UniProtKB/Swiss-Prot annotation:
Keywords: Disulfide bond, Ion channel impairing toxin, Knottin, Neurotoxin, Potassium channel impairing toxin, Secreted, Toxin, Voltage-gated potassium channel impairing toxin. Monomer. It comes from Theraphosa blondi (Goliath birdeating spider). It holds the Pfam family Toxin_12. Disulfide bonds join C3-C18, C10-C23, C17-C30. This is Kappa-theraphotoxin-Tb1b. The keyword Membrane does not apply. GO terms for molecular function: ion channel inhibitor activity; potassium channel regulator activity; toxin activity.
Length: 35
């Protein structure tokens, strides 16, 4: 499976973002996890 890179649109219920990235429900983008 390909993961989603920075600022890719994503589905918060089905987060396919790359490691160390998280799908933000507010923006529906993959962003860096800061914690």
């Amino acid at each position: 499976d390909d993961c989603l890179g920075m600022f890719s649109s994503c589905d918060p219920k089905n987060d396919k973002c790359c490691p160390n990235r998280v799908c933000r429900s507010r923006d529906q983008w993959c962003k860096y996890k800061l914690w």
